[in-house]
Curated annotation (Swiss-Prot):
Name of the gene encoding the protein in the UniProt record: atpB
Quaternary organization: F-type ATPases have 2 components, CF(1) - the catalytic core - and CF(0) - the membrane proton channel. CF(1) has five subunits: alpha(3), beta(3), gamma(1), delta(1), epsilon(1). CF(0) has four main subunits: a(1), b(1), b'(1) and c(9-12).
S-adenosyl-L-methionine in keyword set: no
First and last residue of the signal peptide: none
Protein name: ATP synthase subunit beta, chloroplastic
Superkingdom: Eukaryota
InterPro entries in alphabetical order: AAA+_ATPase, ATP-synt_VA_C, ATP_synth_F1_bsu, ATPase_a/bsu_AS, ATPase_alpha/beta_chains, ATPase_F1/V1/A1_a/bsu_N, ATPase_F1/V1/A1_a/bsu_N_sf, ATPase_F1/V1/A1_a/bsu_nucl-bd
Enzyme Commission number, as recorded: 7.1.2.2
Known role: Produces ATP from ADP in the presence of a proton gradient across the membrane. The catalytic sites are hosted primarily by the beta subunits.
One annotated GO molecular function: ATP hydrolysis activity
Catalyzed chemical reaction(s): ATP + H2O + 4 H(+)(in) = ADP + phosphate + 5 H(+)(out)
Chain residues that bind ATP: 156-163
Protein's organism: Trichomanes davallioides (Kilau fern)
Length: 479
């Protein structure tokens, strides 16, 4: 016996539905509206119950456009929250918020599904040991290391290499950790989603010939979708990632691009749901909404979800409630700098602006900590001397400062690295550098062992041995 109600009111993406007494659906239940509009086109809309209004009515948010819906149409209560397919079958395919494939590769086997609303792992299941998540990218591992099961904010404007960095991470976790990735595109441009998909196919992160060999599942709810979809697509992606962590016991990377759009979508429907706005017009439930998403991203004793979230900062105001609420959850930040990208230093991660709570001697060890501090001090000094160099030239500096500048320039170049997914642009094969090799390399530069090598030798190489080899070949070319 189906529980059927009728639409009583529609305001944009929000609609009210009346059910018979005693038959009210639960909050977060998914409702289906099927039928035809006056033009005879099929209507198939899924909604999610948000409020019980009393008088046997509920208020729900639609996951797709509400065009063509009318009062009095029948609404079926499915009796359960929205469920999406999970497991290996999701790899290599693109899904929407409802878990339907949208890549025209045919239907997906939905024998295993999970509801998108699940409680966070119990405190007793959490992995309390702090460990570093090695990415194989020198600048990240040395100066702002990621925490296994942590949350990382990725800041950067357009065209500084966010996408390439994301793809390299997806590639490296698959190679080094045997892990998989889930990419949640939340309220970003459809064109970017398409570009990412094409680039992933090109760099073999998605294997077209053998889809099951792919390393990533994509979930998109882009800018053109109604707010309901953008508000929930993050949970859909997270649910797919949780399956890999809890059932397959793997290390998972979860990308959310962009976490701000998740908050924005919530604020779009908040007023329509009749809630009082809070600061700057955001939803009063901002902290809770963010918390319920973020608390599910964590390490358990079985596996981990490490999440990398692109953070858009509205009007560059870091005190805006949306980014400010996000910061409370982050373990590390990776800041991309346009200045470095302009110099051709990729990945253009700003070594002085990027931070990590993991960079403590008792977590990473004295050696790593000292090396990182040394690198930062050298770069900071170089930054301070830049005005003097610009006005007076290098010759006016003291002997000590000239040495610092020379080492800083070597460090700056050594922080660049050829990526596997960017072999097309750089023409040199990608390099994965282990943390031990990274620390060794920077220690050698700081100690002055390599003062006699030209700075070009450090540009776009993997470990320090490659730099010495490159120096020799440069010398041969010079002769």
């Amino acid at each position: 016996e189906k529980n059927v109600g009728q639409i009583t009111q529609i305001i944009g993406p929000v609609l009210d539905v009346a059910f018979s007494p005693g038959k009210m659906p639960n909050i977060y239940n998914s409702l289906l509206i099927k039928g035809q509009n006056p033009a005879g086109q099929e209507i198939n809309v899924t909604c999610e119950v948000q409020q019980l209004l009393g008088n046997n009515e509920v208020r729900a948010v639609a996951m797709s456009a509400t065009d063509g819906l009318m009062r009095g149409m029948n609404v079926v209560d499915t009796g359960a929250p929205l469920s999406v397919p999970v497991g290996e079958i999701t790899l290599g395919x693109i899904f929407n918020v409802l878990g339907d494939p949208v890549d025209n590769l045919g239907p997906v086997d939905t024998s295993t599904t999970f509801p998108i609303h699940r409680s966070a792992p119990a405190f007793t299941q959490l992995d309390t040991k702090l460990s570093i998540f090695e990415t194989g990218i020198k600048v990240v591992d040395l100066l702002a290391p990621y925490r296994r099961g942590g949350k990382i904010g990725l800041f950067g404007g357009a065209g500084v290499g966010k996408t390439v960095l994301i793809m390299e991470l997806i590639n490296n976790i698959a190679k080094a950790h045997g892990g998989v990735s889930v990419f949640g595109g939340v309220g970003e441009r459809t064109r970017e989603g398409n570009d990412l998909y094409m680039e992933m196919k090109e760099s073999k992160v998605i294997n077209e010939q053998n889809i099951s060999e792919s390393k990533v599942a994509l979930v998109y709810g882009q800018m053109n979708e109604p707010p309901g979809a953008r508000m929930r697509v993050g949970l859909t992606a997270l649910t797919m990632a949780e399956y890999f962590r809890d059932v397959n016991k793997q290390d998972v990377l979860l990308f959310i691009d962009n976490i701000f759009r998740f908050v924005q979508a919530g604020s779009e429907v908040s007023a329509l749901l009749g809630r009082m706005p809070s600061a700057v017009g955001y939803q009063p439930t901002l902290g809770t909404e963010m918390g319920t998403l973020q608390e599910r991203i964590t390490s358990t004793k079985e596996g981990s979800i490490t999440s990398i979230q692109a953070v858009y900062v509205p009007a560059d105001d870091l005190t805006d409630p949306a980014p400010a609420t996000t910061f409370a959850h982050l373990d590390a930040t990776t800041v991309l700098s346009r200045g470095l990208a302009a110099k051709g230093i990729y990945p253009a991660v700003d070594p002085l602006d990027s931070t990590s709570t993991m960079l403590q001697p008792w977590i990473v060890g004295e050696e790593h900590y000292e090396t990182a501090q040394g690198v930062k001090q050298t770069l900071q000094r170089y930054k301070e001397l830049q005005d003097i160099i610009a006005i007076l030239g290098l010759d006016e500096l003291s002997e000590e400062d000239r040495l610092t500048v020379a080492r800083a320039r070597k460090i700056e170049r050594f922080l660049s690295q050829p990526f596997f997914v960017a072999e097309v642009f750089t023409g040199s094969p990608g390099k994965y550098v282990s943390l031990i090799e990274t620390i060794k390399g920077f220690q050698m530069i700081l100690s002055g062992e390599l003062d006699n090598l030209p700075e070009q030798a450090f540009y776009l190489v993997g470990n320090i041995d490659e730099a010495t080899t490159k120096a020799v070949s440069l010398q041969v070319e010079g002769q």
